[in-house]
Design a protein with these regions (language model features):
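Short active-site oxyanion
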Residues: 27-33, 48-49, 71, 96-97
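Catalytic cysteine-centered active loop of the rhodanese-like fold, especially the PTP/DSP P-loop
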Residues: 63-109
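Short loop/helix-cap segments at secondary-structure boundaries that form the rim of catalytic
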Residues: 42-48, 108
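Glycine-rich, charge-decorated loop segments at or immediately adjacent to ligand/cofactor-binding or catalytic sites
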Residues: 109-115
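Short, hinge-like loop/turn segments at secondary-structure boundaries
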Residues: 51, 69, 115-119
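A conditional alpha-helix N-cap/helix-loop micro-motif detector
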Residues: 13, 52-55
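Alpha-helical scaffolding within the catalytic cores
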Residues: 57-62
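Flexible, polar/low-complexity N-terminal or interdomain linker segments that lie immediately upstream
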Residues: 1-41, 117-136
């Protein structure tokens, strides 16, 4: 594999906080953002519009509201956390499109982006795609 192939492959499966923020700012995200941390961590602050679905709860039944064509961007606490990787593996096993947001919540805060504090999680019955603008 040459350098071009390597970096193109990385971009196929990774995004960063800046790109996600710009997509949200422009109103054009074509993916669902999943915060795969605990409900407590999510409630303390998360990426605006993100849905809380801890990585261990990523199963087909919990994704039924989203068409198979929907892509997901997952994040966890940050580079010290492998929750986003675990979530990406689960989504990929379910043949779902997925990218990991590099930096996670630590990167989001480092970049100075705003946090949302409202609760919107699978446990509270908000896993219906309504916050994403993507048709269910």
């Amino acid at each position: 594999m040459n350098a071009l192939e390597h970096f193109e492959k990385l971009l196929e499966f990774e995004t960063d906080c800046w790109d996600v923020h710009e997509d949200l700012r422009s109103g054009k995200p074509d993916y669902v953002i999943l915060d795969v941390r605990s409900p407590e961590a999510y409630g303390a602050g998360h990426v605006p519009g993100a849905i809380n679905l801890p990585h261990g709860r990523i199963v087909e039944g919990n994704l039924a509201a989203f068409p198979a064509s929907v892509a997901f961007v997952v994040y966890c606490s940050g580079p010290h956390c492998n929750g986003a990787d675990k979530a990406a593996v689960r989504l990929a096993r379910l043949n779902r499109k997925v990218k990991k947001m590099l930096g996670g919540m630590a990167g989001w805060k480092w970049d100075g982006f705003e946090l949302e504090l409202e609760v919107g999680s699978h446990e509270t019955g908000n896993l219906d795609g309504s916050k994403t603008g993507i048709p269910a």
